[in-house]
């Protein structure tokens, strides 16, 4: 009986999500106001970069993406950090396995389960654009994080793997559509020192660098960076720019 109830609830949720998807699906208007080449010199260590996806491999992938982005009024589904080192720009990010550009990115283990990677920024933009036709956005940090501090804070995450996707989707669903407090409590219960999400990595590193304040890292979703309330979790001596959307023209 309990199993039937659970199955019924899942079916109702899936049907509801599909209805919301078809009712709200709209073509994304290209609203980028900058070109990458015009803002390239502004990037520095500690900037937060966001990625969106406009092309999906399957309808199921599109529904999953919709449920954690457009359903809550967001456009971006992935987040990473910028590193400027010796005039070169890199994205430091936590991704699943075979993320766009993985063939040229540097990873720190070969477990085949994703994790932290380093990739040149322009390569990441080019590969992401090729696979997903995405657009991008950045928040520029007011004061660059010294590279020695940045390296020290990211190195402890090198051998972790990407978080379980079912767990990730469950936390996202509860946080966005049910109750934030419940999701926060579950995130604490589910906490695993060996696994991370992209947002969790970004928040943990910036928090360790004293750039942003405490927040449940496991449920630090990309849309939070896009949200106007983002400034509420900044340290008093650090600020970030408004969200700057941009396109990359290879």
UniProtKB/Swiss-Prot annotation:
Its main location: membrane. InterPro entries: Papain-like_cys_pep_sf. It is found in: Membrane. This is Uncharacterized protein R372. It comes from the Viruses. The chain crosses the membrane at residues 2-22. Keywords: Membrane, Transmembrane, Transmembrane helix. GO terms for cellular component: membrane. It is a single-pass membrane protein.
């Amino acid at each position: 009986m309990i199993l039937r109830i659970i199955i019924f609830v899942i079916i109702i949720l899936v049907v509801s999500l599909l209805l919301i998807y078809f009712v709200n699906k709209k073509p994304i208007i290209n609203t980028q106001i900058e070109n990458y080449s015009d803002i390239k010199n502004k990037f520095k260590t500690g900037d937060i970069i966001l990625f969106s996806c406009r092309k999906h491999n399957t309808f199921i992938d599109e529904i999953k993406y919709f449920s954690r982005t457009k359903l809550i009024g967001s456009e971006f589904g992935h987040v990473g950090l910028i590193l400027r080192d010796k005039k070169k720009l890199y994205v430091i990010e936590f991704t699943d396995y075979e993320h766009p550009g993985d063939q040229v990115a540097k990873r720190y283990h070969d477990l085949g389960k994703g994790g932290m990677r380093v990739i040149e920024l322009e390569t990441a933009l080019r590969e992401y654009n090729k696979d997903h036709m995405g657009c991008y956005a950045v928040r520029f940090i007011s004061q660059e994080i010294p590279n020695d501090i940045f390296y020290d804070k990211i190195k402890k995450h090198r051998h972790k793997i990407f978080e379980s996707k079912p767990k990730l989707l469950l936390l996202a669903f509860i946080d966005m559509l049910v109750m934030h407090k419940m999701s926060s409590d579950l995130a604490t219960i589910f906490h695993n020192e060996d696994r991370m999400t992209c947002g969790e990595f970004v928040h943990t590193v910036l928090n360790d660098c004293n750039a942003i304040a405490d927040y449940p890292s496991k449920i630090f979703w990309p849309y939070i960076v896009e949200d106007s309330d983002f400034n509420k979790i900044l340290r008093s001596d650090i600020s970030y720019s408004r969200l700057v959307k941009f396109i990359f023209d290879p």
